Amino acid sequence: MITYDDEVVCAPRAGTLYDVLELILDRGMVIDVFVRVSLVGIEILKVDARIVVASVDTYLRFAEACNRLDLEHDVRSKTVPEMFGSPMAKTVGRAGARRTARSLTDKVRDVLTPEHEHEEEPEEAEDRPRAGAERGRSTQRPRSRPAARPRDEDDRPRSRPRRRTEEEDR
C-alpha cells in the first residue's frame, strides 16, 4: 500500500497509458548514448545519440547536470579526412607512389631487355657473395637492381629477333 503525507491510503491500481506518459513526461526518460571506437589511436567510429522522452524542462535539467547541452567538435579527436590530410599521411603516400613507380620501371625493364641477358643473370648472381653474408660497416645499402647509368641513343629498346620454330629450321 502506498501512503502519502496526508495519511491517505491509496490502493495500488493499474495505470492507464495516459498515466504512464504523464509520469514519464513529468519525471522524464532520457537514453543518452556516447560511443567512440578507436583502433590504435585512430578514431574509427563516433556515435553520440540521445533518445529523449521528456518535457523540455526535464531534458534541459538533465543536459545541464551532465554538461551535455552542446555537441561541439572535440579538438583532440581526429577524423579520417584529417588523418589523410596530415603531413605524415602525405609522406606515407609519396613513399607508396615511389615503390609503385620503381616496381613498374623494373617490370618495363624486364620486358624490354632481351631474353639472353635474363639467362646470364642467374649465373652472375651465384658468383656474387650475398649481401647478408658480409656485414661490413658500409654506409650504402645493398641494391636489388643494377645502378642506373646515363642513357645514350644506343640504349633505346630494340625489337627482339623472332625465334625460329623447328619447322623453319628444317
UniProtKB/Swiss-Prot annotation:
Biased composition (Basic and acidic residues): 104-119, 127-137, 149-170
GO molecular function, one term: structural molecule activity
Chain segments carrying region Disordered: 86-170
Keywords: Gas vesicle
InterPro entries for this protein: Gas-vesicle_GvpA-like, Gas_vesicle_GvpA, GvpA, GvpA-like_CS
Keyword match Transcription regulation: no
Induction: Constitutively transcribed at low levels, repressed by argR.
GO cellular component, one term: vesicle membrane
Record's signal peptide: none
Biased composition (Basic residues): 138-148
Localization annotation: Gas vesicle shell
NCBIfam families according to UniProt: PRK09368.1
Function: Gas vesicles are hollow, gas filled proteinaceous nanostructures found in some microorganisms. During planktonic growth they allow positioning of the organism at a favorable depth for light or nutrient acquisition. GvpA forms the protein shell. It is not clear what function GVs perform in soil bacteria.
Oligomer status and interactors: The gas vesicle shell is 2 nm thick and consists of a single layer of this protein. It forms helical ribs nearly perpendicular to the long axis of the vesicle.
Xref: HAMAP family: Gas_vesicle_A
Family of this protein: Belongs to the gas vesicle GvpA family.
Protein name, entry field: Gas vesicle protein A2
Protein source organism: Streptomyces coelicolor (strain ATCC BAA-471 / A3(2) / M145)
Gene name for this UniProt entry: gvpA2
